[in-house]
Regions:
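Short beta-strand to alpha-helix junction loop
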Residues: 2-20, 32, 113, 191-199, ...
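Feature captures the FAD/FMN-dependent oxidoreductase FAD-binding
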Residues: 4-76
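A conserved short coil-to-beta-strand element within the FAD-binding core of flavoproteins
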Residues: 33-49, 102, 244-266
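Rossmann-like dinucleotide-binding core of oxidoreductases
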Residues: 59, 68-202, 271, 325, ...
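Glycine-rich beta-alpha-beta "Rossmann" dinucleotide-binding loop(s) and their flanking helix/strand
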Residues: 68, 72-97, 128, 243, ...
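C-terminal active-site-capping segments
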Residues: 342, 346-446
Length: 446
């Protein structure tokens, strides 16, 4: 019976929905809170050892499981910068993902490091309550309007009839992305150079019109293609910089150190602050614990990650981003090679969850104890992912999707093949098509 109140609901409403689901399906009894997985190890046929750290009493325990699903999410491990002297700061400081609920920002001198999605939400939310807000920008960000609105009556009726998921799926599968009604686009248009260039011109003009100071407007205008990096879907971001208490710092060398009273810049400038908010993103690399499969092979080994490359996924090899060979009964939700930067992740999770549940149930009925992908199926999917990135706009700048561009390869850097760069519809067609009649060509059961 839950119906969202508007198009973009708040964190509180999303949390309420999660609570509703937990109570509706009576699964709270099965949830272990303040328990951190520190290692997964395949120990025997049909058996995984799960090492768990209790964060309350700092003790370690272990359980054994037949199937393991990693649903921790790729954007769940906050990445803090490594500025010298961070421990010296006398004021309050925290990452946006670990927001200090006790922090009182009213009337304070606040600095925020970063201009990504989290930063933009914070900037527009707190500008009116702080004494001053200094935004430390490394890279400008494209933004489009979301024009939030209450859930319309026809959608409410669709919810009541149980058809809203189908409506969402239709919009997503058709490749329509309508958050800004004044700028609709399709998946194909996004990668058309002429179309993209025209959109950049349009959005640049919007920034000029929104920002009173021409110099600030210039600094807030990106120099890379639309959607090459994650785009902000937010209202009032640029106009917030017209407020007298909001200041933009765009030092090319960025922050170099933290001292007792604030941030030191490469230019030598010192910005005195009472609160520092780090909106510095997430470590979107490997699952944040060791996963060891057959014969001691680790997930890091499978994905080409090592200490030399800061354990980034250089060349993940999976089937649909869900299965990894030599890792029987191991499944990843929203894993590498399963989504692109405009994927509707909610729908992806729904379909992957259904796939895993159906697979495990069918194995039980068929008296099968293990499943893993065939090596040839993994190679085939990885090859498809490699080809899928050709011609895509995401290759034209350095971003967390690709971990480097084609040009970087000449300097010895390998761009990541960590995503399925075709449409979400095409991914689901592969997943559902493989699940409905081609399993013997893709999966090995025992």
């Amino acid at each position: 019976g839950f119906i969202p109140s508007k198009r973009y609901v708040s964190q509180t409403e999303i949390a309420d929905y999660a609570e509703l689901l937990v109570d509706h399906f009576d699964i709270r009894q099965h949830i272990k809170f303040l328990q951190k997985v520190v290692a997964l190890e395949y120990v025997d046929f049909g058996k995984w050892r799960v090492e768990i750290s209790n964060l309350e009493n700092e003790t370690n325990t272990e359980i054994f499981a037949k199937h393991v699903v990693c649903a921790n999410g790729p954007l769940s491990s906050p990445r803090m910068p490594e500025f010298g002297g961070m421990e010296k700061f006398k004021g309050e400081s925290f990452h946006t993902a670990e927001w200090d609920q006790e922090a009182n920002l009213k009337g304070k001198k606040v600095g925020i490091v970063g201009t990504g999605a989290s930063a933009a939400q914070v900037i527009t939310s707190i500008a009116d309550e702080v004494e001053s807000l200094t935004v430390f920008q490394r890279t400008a960000t494209w933004a489009i309007e979301r024009e939030d609105q209450p859930t319309p009556p026809d959608i409410v009726e669709a919810f009541k009839a149980g058809g809203y998921s189908s409506k969402l799926r239709y919009v997503d599968w058709k490749g329509e992305y309508p958050p800004d009604p004044n700028l609709p686009f399709t998946f194909e248009q996004l990668h058309d150079k002429n179309w993209n260039s025209a959109v950049c011109d349009l959005l640049s003009e919007r920034i000029k019109n929104d920002v009173n100071d021409p110099e600030v407007a210039k600094l807030l205008t990106p120099d890379y293609p639309f959607f090459c990096k994650r785009v902000l879907i937010i209202d009032d971001y640029f106009t917030t910089f017209n407020k007298e208490n909001v200041h933009l710092v765009n030092d090319p060398g960025g922050v170099v150190a933290v001292n007792e009273t604030g941030l030191e810049m490469s230019s030598g400038d010192l910005h005195e602050l009472e609160v520092i908010i780090y909106a510095t993103g997430f470590d979107a690399g490997l699952i944040p614990f060791t996963v060891t499969g057959k014969n001691g092979i680790t997930l890091a080994d499978k994905f080409g990650a090592s200490a030399e490359n800061n354990f980034q996924m250089i060349e993940p090899k999976t089937l649909w981003g869900l299965h990894v060979n030599d890792m029987p009964n191991f499944y990843m939700m929203v894993g590498p090679q399963s989504l692109n930067p405009v994927t509707n992740v909610t729908l992806l999770c729904e379909e992957q969850g259904k796939y895993i549940a159906k697979l495990v149930s069918s194995m039980k009925l068929d008296n099968k104890d293990e499943v893993e992908p065939l090596a040839k199926a993994v190679k085939n999917w990885t090859d498809k992912c490699n080809v899928s990135s050709d011609g895509k706009i995401w290759l034209q700048c350095n971003n967390w999707y690709m971990k480097g561009t084609k040009d970087d390869q000449s300097a010895g850097r390998s761009r990541s093949k960590a995503m399925w760069m075709e449409s979400h519809e095409s991914y689901l067609n592969h997943l559902l098509g493989g699940a409905d009649g081609h399993q013997d060509e893709l999966l090995k059961f025992s």
